[in-house]
C-alpha cells in the first residue's frame, strides 16, 4: 500500500516518492561496531563470572547482617564488592569511560526482612557522547542476590547460579564489551540486590531514577537466563515478557486505551518488539532468538522489571524457555535420587552468552539511534478512509528521516514499513480503523528508534447554540 506524503510541514526540499510497503523491517545494513561487540561476548567469561558469584557461598540479602561472612570473603557484601571491582576494571580498560557507583540504602523491617538491612545496588554508567542524546538512557540489569529454600535464611548455601548469577553475568558482560565503544545515548549496567526479599533493590533504584528525572527509555531485566540443562529446554529461545496495559496508567490514559484498542501498544511492548527486530537483524542465523510473551511475568512470580514499570518506565524481562524448579530456591541436597539446588553445573554458558549478545545488540542499537519522534498524532477530526499522521522532530536533532510502520490489529509484531523521508506529516491510503500505526526515526547509518504509536487528535465538539433568556424570546 503506497503512502502519499503531505510536505507542507516538511523540511525544505524534503520530498519522497510513493513506493510500495516493505515487508520485514529488519532488512538494514549491519553496524560493524555492533557486530564486533557481539563477537567479543565470551561464554568463558560468562562462566567465570557465574562461578565467582557462586563462590561467595550465599548472596542472600540478609547475609549483609553477618559481619563474619564478609571477613571470610563470603556473603552478599563480598559479592557486591567484587561486582564493583569488575566494573572498575572495565572502566580502567576504557580509560575511565564508566562511572561506577553504589546505590546504597537501609531497608526497614518488612516482608522477608526481619531487621534493618543494608542493601546496595551496583551500577556503571557509560555516558553518551552527544549532549542531547545522552539524556536518553537505556539500562540492563540482573539481580545478584540469591536464596535457598527460605528467603530469610542468610547462612545456608545459596549458589544461585541461574537465579540470578546468570542475569548478573549478562549485565557485566554487556558492560565489558560495550564499554569499548562510544554511543550518542547513555547506557547503564546494573546489578541489584533484595530481589528475593521483594524487589527492594530495583524498587529503590527505579524510584531514584524517577526522582532525578532520568529519561529512562528502556530497561532490559535478565532473570533466570541460564538455559538450565533440563528435559524440554529449548536452547534457541529466550522468553521476553512485557506488560500490555501499563500499571502506572492514569484513569484518563486507561480510557484512551479502551477507546483506541491500545492494550498491546505500551512502551514496554514496543521495547519487546524492538528486541525481536534486533534479533532478526543481528542474530540472523535463526539458531537463537526471543519468544515474545505478552504478559508482565510468569504466574506466581515477579521480577525487577516491574519495579521500573510501576514508576512509568518501559521495561521487559528475559527468562529461559523452560524452568526447572528443583534448581531454583532450593536448599542444596539430594532426595529420592533427585538433586536439588541452583548449581553451576546446570547452567548452559553458551546459552547465557547468546542472551548477553541479544541484550548488547539491543542496547547498542538503541543508544546509537536518534530519539523517538515526539507529539505523534493521528488526525481524527472527520470521517475518512485515509489516515493522516503528524509528529515533531526527534528532540536530540539527530534524525535524518522517519519511517511509518504498521500491522493488523491482531498481529504481534510490526509487519510493514515505509520510508517517508525528513517530513513531519504523512497521509496514508489505508484506514486507521483496520491497523495499528507507529512512527520511528532513523539516522544516516540506519539506526532506528523505538516506534511511537500516534495518539488521536479528537474531533473538537461544537459548542451548543446559546439559549436566549426568557425576556429575549419572541
Predicted regions and their residues:
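Alpha-helical metal-binding/catalytic segments enriched in His/Glu/Asp
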Residues: 124, 140-199, 359
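Extracellular fibronectin type III
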Residues: 442-473
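Active-site-adjacent mobile loop/cap segments within catalytic or ligand-binding domains
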Residues: 54, 225-246, 292-370
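Metal-dependent peptidase/peptidase-like ectodomains
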Residues: 192-303, 311, 315
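Beta-strand-rich modules
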Residues: 427-449
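Short beta-strand segments within Ig-like beta-sandwich modules, predominantly Fibronectin type-III
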Residues: 416-423
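Conserved aromatic anchor
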Residues: 385-398
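A non-catalytic alpha/beta surface segment that caps or lines the substrate-entry region
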Residues: 23, 45-127
Amino acid at each position: 500500500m503506497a503512502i502519499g506524503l503531505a510536505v507542507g510541514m516538511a523540511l525544505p526540499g524534503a520530498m519522497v516518492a510513493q513506493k510500495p510497503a516493505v515487508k520485514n523491517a529488519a532488512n538494514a545494513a549491519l553496524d560493524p561496531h555492533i557486530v564486533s561487540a557481539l563477537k567479543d561476548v565470551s561464554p568463558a567469561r560468562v562462566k567465570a563470572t557465574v562461578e565467582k558469584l557462586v563462590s561467595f557461598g550465599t548472596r542472600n540479602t540478609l547475609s549483609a547482617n553477618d559481619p563474619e561472612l564478609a571477613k571470610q570473603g563470603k556473603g552478599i557484601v563480598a559479592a557486591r564488592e567484587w561486582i564493583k571491582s569488575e566494573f572498575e576494571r572495565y572502566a580502567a580498560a576504557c580509560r575511565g569511560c564508566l562511572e561506577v557507583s553504589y546505590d546504597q540504602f537501609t531497608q526497614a523491617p518488612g516482608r522477608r526482612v526481619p531487621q534493618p538491612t543494608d542493601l546496595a545496588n551496583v551500577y556503571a554508567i557509560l555516558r553518551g557522547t552527544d549532549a542531547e542524546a545522552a539524556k536518553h538512557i537505556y539500562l540492563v540489569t540482573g539481580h545478584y542476590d540469591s536464596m535457598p529454600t527460605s528467603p530469610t535464611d542468610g547462612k545456608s548455601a545459596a549458589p544461585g547460579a541461574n537465579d540470578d548469577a546468570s542475569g548478573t553475568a549478562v549485565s557485566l558482560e554487556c558492560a565489558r564489551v560495550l564499554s569499548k565503544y562510544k554511543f550518542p545515548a547513555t547506557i547503564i549496567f546494573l546489578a541489584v540486590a533484595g530481589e528475593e526479599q521483594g524487589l527492594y533493590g530495583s524498587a529503590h533504584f527505579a524510584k531514584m531514577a524517577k526522582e532525578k528525572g532520568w529519561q529512562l527509555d528502556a530497561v532490559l531485566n535478565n532473570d533466570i537466563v541460564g538455559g538450565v540443562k533440563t528435559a524440554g529446554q529449548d536452547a534457541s529461545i529466550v522468553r521476553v515478557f512485557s506488560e500490555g496495559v501499563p500499571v502506572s496508567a492514569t484513569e484518563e490514559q486507561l480510557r484512551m486505551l479502551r477507546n483506541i484498542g491500545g492494550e498491546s501498544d505500551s512502551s514496554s511492548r514496543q521495547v519487546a518488539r524492538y528486541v525481536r527486530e534486533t534479533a532478526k537483524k543481528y542474530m540472523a542465523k535463526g539458531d537463537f532468538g526471543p519468544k515474545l510473551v505478552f504478559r508482565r511475568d510468569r504466574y506466581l512470580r515477579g521480577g525487577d522489571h516491574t519495579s521500573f514499570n510501576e514508576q512509568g518506565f518501559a521495561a521487559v524481562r528475559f527468562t529461559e524457555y523452560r524452568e526447572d524448579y528443583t534448581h531454583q530456591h532450593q536448599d542444596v541436597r539430594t532426595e529420592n535420587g533427585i538433586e536439588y539446588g541452583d548449581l553451576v553445573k546446570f547452567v548452559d554458558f553458551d546459552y547465557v552468552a547468546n542472551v548477553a549478545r541479544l541484550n548488547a545488540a539491543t542496547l547498542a542499537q538503541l543508544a546509537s539511534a536518534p530519539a523517538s519522534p515526539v507529539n505523534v498524532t493521528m488526525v481524527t477530526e472527520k470521517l475518512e478512509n485515509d489516515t493522516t499522521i503528524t509528529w515533531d522532530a526527534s528532540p536530540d536533532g539527530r534524525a535524518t528521516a522517519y519511517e511509518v510502520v504498521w500491522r493488523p490489529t491482531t498481529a504481534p509484531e510490526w509487519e510493514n514499513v515505509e520510508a517517508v523521508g525528513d517530513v513531519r506529516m504523512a497521509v496514508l491510503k489505508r484506514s486507521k480503523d483496520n491497523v495499528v500505526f507507529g512512527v520511528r526515526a532513523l539516522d544516516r547509518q540506519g539506526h532506528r528508534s523505538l516506534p511511537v504509536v500516534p495518539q488521536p487528535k479528537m474531533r473538537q465538539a461544537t459548542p451548543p447554540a446559546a439559549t436566549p433568556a426568557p425576556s429575549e424570546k419572541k
